């Protein structure tokens, strides 16, 4: 009798908790909770709870997971995945240009204002030590240990954050990350204004912590950068990745997900492929699982796993996506935090007076960095800065002044030049990313793909130098 009462009470509690969660999510949706500079923090608690649950469950059938992504190729089954993406490389951009309408007049939008909220992740609570219980490490006294910790903190504070850039090697399109100089040494020649001072009274803009936040993001982007050399373990990885990314963009656009979700999904996918050799006919499962993980991390309301399975046309079942999610998270050690390029673009847009024209064009150019295989291994902050630089050139704006250099993280024109050349090569070249180009030819995105392609073709035809254009 008592056991039945306990079961009934537990069911009642669970139903009340689910009801409370649904009501709280509905309230958040009705209030239009602003996204913070580090992403949507309202969903982090659920994500951490699910991750901890996955850790507790563990890999009960490890031998099965080892065979989940077999190493041998199965060409016959892979044809079912690649047959629907055999579009011509030459006809995609011409179709986009032929279907264009009258390009609308650009204007400014106050709704594009950056909104931030305070993030407590950089503040930690100090642990109080009892006077009667002293913690020793190898018979060291508390005073000696505290002095040693303070010394380490002073040494860390003296370190300057390196600024990474790209250096072109020979005639090949190979790039290598280098530490050129420190931020203070780069910016000492330029004058810039403290644009965060005007936001000191706005708690949503976190002007006091914004520098610490972006210092952390610059550190995080180096840690989560995929190793391009490891991707060559896969056969025909460039072509297969192009097909997979094109399909992911299609599903992302169909579900109406956030841009941050797409960037995170591609980053998780690239990092996983660097660690694991995947069978060709399992690539679609990898892409689906990565998009499913990213949507649960970034979105307030994530699409159901049944919807993801339905979009694969029977290639992946619900159980396959669940197994893929667990396997990918375990392989990445549940490290899915990512320095999203949208965060850096919002920061640079502050120095650009939040202009919607250049910002929309920069979104299109910045998304090229995840669809083109050449951009793997380039820092997201550098891609965001190059996209903003090139978008301003398209609109005939002024020079890359001190404010833009400072709020981009110290990227000068010389550092942006190699990445801008890669963006130009993509715009004037052929591609199979038809879903990506069609997405940005709509009025919602101010026909950014049409404007960018026409401008790039004109610049290359006349032999203009993009670095000195409109200066």
Swiss-Prot record:
Protein's UniProt keywords contain Translocase: no
Regions annotated as coiled coil: none
Annotated Pfam families: Cyclin_C, Cyclin_N
Gene3D superfamilies listed in its UniProt record: Cyclin-like (1.10.472.10)
GO molecular function annotation: cyclin-dependent protein serine/threonine kinase regulator activity
Cited InterPro entries: Cyclin, Cyclin-like_dom, Cyclin-like_sf, Cyclin_A/B-like, Cyclin_C-dom, Cyclin_N, Cyclins_cyclin-box
Matches recorded under SUPFAM superfamilies: Cyclin-like (SSF47954)
Highest taxon of source: Eukaryota
GO biological process, one term: traversing start control point of mitotic cell cycle
GO cellular component: cyclin-dependent protein kinase holoenzyme complex; cytoplasm; microtubule organizing center; nucleus
Keywords annotated in UniProt: Cell cycle, Cell division, Cyclin, Mitosis
Purpose of the protein: Essential for the control of the cell cycle at the G2/M (mitosis) transition. Interacts with the CDC2 protein kinase to form MPF. G2/M cyclins accumulate steadily during G2 and are abruptly destroyed at mitosis.
Family: Belongs to the cyclin family. Cyclin AB subfamily.
Note: Present with 300 molecules/cell in log phase SD medium.
Listed name of the protein: G2/mitotic-specific cyclin-1
